[in-house]
């Protein structure tokens, strides 16, 4: 995985600079989402690794399956095909999104809850977190019954554990000391 990220970084940087310069961060993000899904598909991975397919055939296949691409995006796919880097498209997409979020002042937040959160509770929690981190947040919510109650929030490298399980673990550690 780390090797793929290293390989993907210059491609993500180039795509980001091209998209930012054209004022097309949104369309590029959408195109990379589609292309990453194509590259992650098991049948497409078999095609990518098939030595019988020429670069032109693979390029045509990816562009047809990848949806409506601009000329710059088609050239980007061609560069990836020519350099045998299609397999790192998911990492390119992830790095591109991170660069886009940094540029737009957006942080990724993962909220794990013991129970489903209603819209009002989620909106209030998101507003509190945005005030605390002084940034807009892209929130991903998951359900983790092992938390027993409460929530565990991860924003960047900071984790806020307000779960019953976390509090019990802290109490157990305090009793051992």
From Swiss-Prot:
Disulfide bonds: none annotated. Belongs to the ATPase delta chain family. F-type ATPases have 2 components, F(1) - the catalytic core - and F(0) - the membrane proton channel. F(1) has five subunits: alpha(3), beta(3), gamma(1), delta(1), epsilon(1). F(0) has three main subunits: a(1), b(2) and c(10-14). The alpha and beta chains form an alternating ring which encloses part of the gamma chain. F(1) is attached to F(0) by a central stalk formed by the gamma and epsilon chains, while a peripheral stalk is formed by the delta and b chains. Keywords: ATP synthesis, Cell inner membrane, Cell membrane, CF(1), Hydrogen ion transport, Ion transport, Membrane, Transport. InterPro entries: ATP_synth_OSCP/delta_N_sf (IPR026015), ATPase_OSCP/dsu (IPR000711). GO terms for molecular function: proton-transporting ATP synthase activity, rotational mechanism. It is a peripheral membrane protein. Its main location: membrane. One of its GO terms (cellular component) is proton-transporting ATP synthase complex. F(1)F(0) ATP synthase produces ATP from ADP in the presence of a proton or sodium gradient. F-type ATPases consist of two structural domains, F(1) containing the extramembraneous catalytic core and F(0) containing the membrane proton channel, linked together by a central stalk and a peripheral stalk. During catalysis, ATP synthesis in the catalytic domain of F(1) is coupled via a rotary mechanism of the central stalk subunits to proton translocation. This protein is part of the stalk that links CF(0) to CF(1). It either transmits conformational changes from CF(0) to CF(1) or is implicated in proton conduction. It is found in: Cell inner membrane. It comes from Azoarcus sp. (strain BH72). This is ATP synthase subunit delta. SUPFAM superfamilies: N-terminal domain of the delta subunit of the F1F0-ATP synthase.
